[in-house]
Design a protein with these regions (language model features):
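NAD(P)+-binding Rossmann beta1-loop-alpha1 motif at the extreme N-terminus of oxidoreductases
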Residues: 2-54, 191-192
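Rossmann-like NAD(P)(H) cofactor-binding subdomain of soluble oxidoreductases
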Residues: 23-24, 45-47, 59-132
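Short acidic capping loops at alpha-helix termini that bridge into adjacent secondary structure
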Residues: 34-37, 88-89, 113, 198
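Internal alpha-helical scaffold of NAD(P)-dependent oxidoreductase catalytic cores
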Residues: 103-113, 129-167, 178-217
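C-terminal substrate-binding/catalytic lobe of Rossmann-fold NAD(P)-dependent oxidoreductases
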Residues: 155, 193-252
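Aromatic-residue-lined binding/catalytic grooves and analogous aromatic/hydrophobic interfacial grooves
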Residues: 175
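Single conserved hydrophobic/aromatic residue that forms the stacking wall/gate
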Residues: 253-261
């Protein structure tokens, strides 16, 4: 992101919880002038107040972006208060899980530029992956700027259709929970084999961290990386056989989509 881009844009952040704070921290680190950021939060933290951004103050008349980082259930109550920014040039960027673009258009107006994004929890440390999709009212330039704003919390990808968001939610949105469960399972297994709990957990965490970094940085596909570390008739193969021993080949392949819950 260029300094010029920061200087010519004003932004309102609705909600400054974990994800909102992560984005704000990223924007400020990358050079966004705190004077050009307004934050609406009912319980501002000491950290937020100390950033120098405009907290719960009079809002700008023509913001470039309004980032929606409040809980989905709060949207019907909160968002109508910002409907006067709708049907114009202001772009609404939502990271509220499960809320479709059509729902925002119903609250803000059919001509409102809206971008729906789905980050995941590693965004809290700048290592997230966010998928975004826009309606037809968003210009190419605005979509690119939104991508740069979202890049403050990690990688950004664009979708071809909002229908893909369900798959994104099941994969990268829920994926960290599956990985955390795997870490716990590895640590428990290690403890049951005689390791103390602290050592087992450290081994599990670093194994997943290292494997993830290797998969992300290597030109070798994960399937081949798995094969490379799996000796015939060895302990790794035996463990994989247990993990894959079900009718569908692997339980992860049958994880529920948001449509199933």
């Amino acid at each position: 992101m260029t300094q010029e881009m920061f200087d010519r844009n004003t932004l309102i952040l609705l909600g400054c919880g974990k994800m909102g704070s992560a984005m704000l921290k990223g924007w400020l680190t990358k050079g966004f002038d705190p004077k050009n950021i307004w934050v609406e939060d009912p319980h501002p933290s000491d950290w937020l107040i100390g950033t120098g951004v405009n907290v719960n103050l009079n809002l700008p008349p023509e913001p470039t972006f309004i980032c929606i980082a409040i809980k989905p259930q709060m949207i019907p109550q909160i968002l109508p208060k910002f409907s006067h920014y709708g049907n114009g040039l202001c772009v609404f960027l939502s990271i509220a899980a499960g809320v479709k673009i059509s729902s925002f258009q119903a609250l803000l107006g059919q001509k409102t530029p809206i971008i729906r994004a789905m980050p995941n929890t590693p965004a809290e440390i700048g290592l997230g992956i966010t998928a975004q999709i826009a309606n037809e009212n968003v210009s190419k330039d605005a979509f690119e700027v939104a991508g740069k704003l979202l890049s403050a919390i990690g990688e950004v990808v664009s979708l071809n259709s909002e229908d893909q968001m369900d798959a994104v939610t099941g994969l990268s949105g829920s994926g960290p929970a599956y990985v955390f469960y795997l870490i716990d399972a590895l640590a428990v297994a290690g403890h049951e084999q005689g390791l103390d709990k602290e050592l087992a957990m450290k081994l599990a965490k670093m194994t997943v961290l290292g494997a993830g970094k290797l998969a992300a940085s290597s030109s070798v596909v994960p399937t081949d990386l798995r094969v490379n570390v799996t000796s015939p008739n060895g302990t790794t193969e035996a463990g994989l056989n247990i993990l894959m021993d079900n009718e569908n080949g692997c339980l992860l392949y049958t994880s529920p989509s948001p449509r199933d819950v």
